[in-house]
Amino acid sequence: KKYIKKIIAFAVPLLLACVILVSSTLETYADAPYRTYTVDGYGSMTETQTAYLPFKTITKIGEETLVNPTDFTLLEDGYMYVLDSGNKRVVVSDADNELVMTFGEGILQGPRGIYVTPEHITYIADRDAKSVFVFDGDGELVNTYTKPTAAMYGETLDFLPLKIVVNSSGVMYVICESNTNGMVEISPVDGGTFLGYFGTNATKANLWTILWRAVLTDAQRAKMQSNIPATPDNMAIDEKGVIYTITRGEHNDTLKRLNIAGVNMIETSEYPDVPAAVAVGNHDNTFVATQTGFIYEYNNEGNLLFIFGGSDDGKQRIGLSTKVEAIQVGTDDKLYVLDSDKAQIQVYEPTEFTRYLHEALYLFSKGRYEESKEPLGKVLEMNNLFTYANMAMGKALYKEGDYEGALKYARLSKDMENYSDSFWEIRNVWLKHNLTAVVLILIGIFAVLKALKLLDKKKGIFNAPRKALKKLGDKKLIRELKYMFTFMRHPIDGCYGIRFENKVSIASTNILLVIMMVFYIINKYFCGFLTKTVREGSYDILSDIGMILVALVLVVSCNYLMCTINEGEGKFRHIYSSL
C-alpha cells in the first residue's frame, strides 16, 4: 500500500502537468485554424507565431445577401464597394457594414473587376458586355469604354475586360481575357484613347525547346504549342500609381512591381502556384492571396514575411477559404479576403507581433534606422530567430557604424552580404589601429630569420634538427607519403613507380585517404561563415565518410575495368594508390 500511495503521489502531479501542457498547446491554435510560416536564413519554410488572427466574417451587407461576388474595393473612409456579380450589381456599405446603396442593375451583364477612386468614382470591367462602365458617387452611369479602335490594339483581338485599376490621372489599366500583349492602357481623353500595352510578360523557353524548334520543319513547328506570354491574373495600384501584377506560372516573376517603363522592380524567391489577388499594404508591404486561401506577405524588397491561411475542408471554419477572388488592406492593417464560393468576406486582424514588425518595416524602408531598432527589439523579444527582424537589425546597426553588432545579427539571419560588409569594416578599423605594429612585427621576424640563417651558416646551430629530419625522412612510410608530391609533378613517372618500383603501399594510401577525409570534414563544417554550405550545428559526418568511400570504390572499380578491357598491367591496389 505504501508503494501504491507513493506511485499515486508521483503520477497525479505528472498527469496534471501533461494536461496543462496539452491544453496550452490546443489553446495556441484555438483562435487560428491554420499555421503561420516564414522563411529562415537558409531559405527553408519554418513555422512561426501567428501573424494574423481571424477577426470576423461578413456574410451580408446590411440585409443584402451576396451571390458569387468576384471583386471589391475598400476605401480609406471605410466604404466598401462589393461587385455582386451573381446579382449583376454593386453593393456599397459604410464603415459599420450598413447598406448605403446598390447600383448597376440592368446595366451590368457579366462584371468581373471593380476599382473605386477616393472620390467614389467606380470603374467596372464587364467581360460579357465587352465594356468598362464608369459610375459617379451616386451610382449613375457617366461613361462607357468599349474596344479601342486604334490599329495598334489589334483588329482580331476581342475586348473582354476582367480587372481594372486607375491612376490619379484617370488613365485605366485593364486586364483582358486572352490578350497576351499586356494590360490595355486607356486614357479618358477624347472618350477613350488607347495608349498602348503595359507590363507585358516575357515568353519562357528553355535551351532544349530552342534547340528542338531549330531542327523542326515549318510544318512541325506550326503543330507545336505556341510560346506566348501569359496574361496577368490580377493587379493592384498603390497611392504613388505603381502597379503590381500577379501571373501564375511565372515563378520568380509571379509577383511584379512595375515601374513607369513596365519593368519589374521586385523579385521573390518564394511565390504561390495559383495566385488569385494582390493588395498593397500600409507599410511598403504587399499581400498575395492564392485561390485556395493561402496569404503571402512580402516586404518592400520582395522578402517573404509570412504565409498563413488555407483551404476550408468543408467544416466552415472561420479564417479558411474555398475560392479567393480579391484581397484588400484596411487603414487599421486588417486584411479583407473575398471568397466567391462562400459569398463572404473574411477579416483578419494582425497580432501584436505583426504590428511591431510592420512598424519596424516601415521605419526601416524610410531610412529611419535608429527609430526602427525599438520595434525590431520588440519583435526579437517575441521571436529571437525571426530572420527578417535579425536582418533588419543588422542593417540598422551597420548604418549606425556598429559593425560588431551588425556582424552578430547578420550571422543570425544568414545575411551574407551584410556580414561581408561588416567584416570588411571591422578589418579596416583593426588595420587602422594596428597596421604599424603589424609592419614592425613582420620586419622583426624577417630580421630574426636572417640572423638565424647567418648563425646556422657559421656555427651550424640547426645541424642536429636537420639530421633528425633526414633520419625521419628516410623511413619507408615517410618516403611513401612524400612520393605524393613527386606523383603530382610527374604523373606518368609516378604511375610507373607505383606499378613497377613499389613506391607506395596500402598503408600510406590509407593514411592519405584519412587525411583527405579530415580536411574535407573540416572544410565543410568548420570553415568561415561566408563559405559554409551547411546549417550551423548540423553534422552528418558518417554520411560524408560513406559518400567518399562509395565514390572512391566506384572510381577505382571503373578505372580497373577500363584497364582490364584495354589489357592494362595495373592491379586494383595500384589504381587505388594512384588515385
Pin down the residues of each PLM region.
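Eukaryotic scaffold repeat domains enriched in small/polar residues
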Residues: 29-390
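Residue-level signature for tetratricopeptide repeat
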Residues: 362, 396, 429-430
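TPR alpha-solenoid repeat register
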Residues: 389, 422-423
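TPR/TPR-like (Sel1-like) alpha-helical repeat modules
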Residues: 398-420
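Selective detector of the "anchor" transmembrane alpha-helix that sits immediately C-terminal
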Residues: 431-455
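N-terminal juxtamembrane cytosolic/stromal segments of multi-pass membrane proteins
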Residues: 456-510
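Hydrophobic alpha-helical transmembrane segments of multi-pass membrane transport/permease proteins
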Residues: 504-524
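Alpha-helical transmembrane segments with an aromatic anchor "belt"
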Residues: 531-579
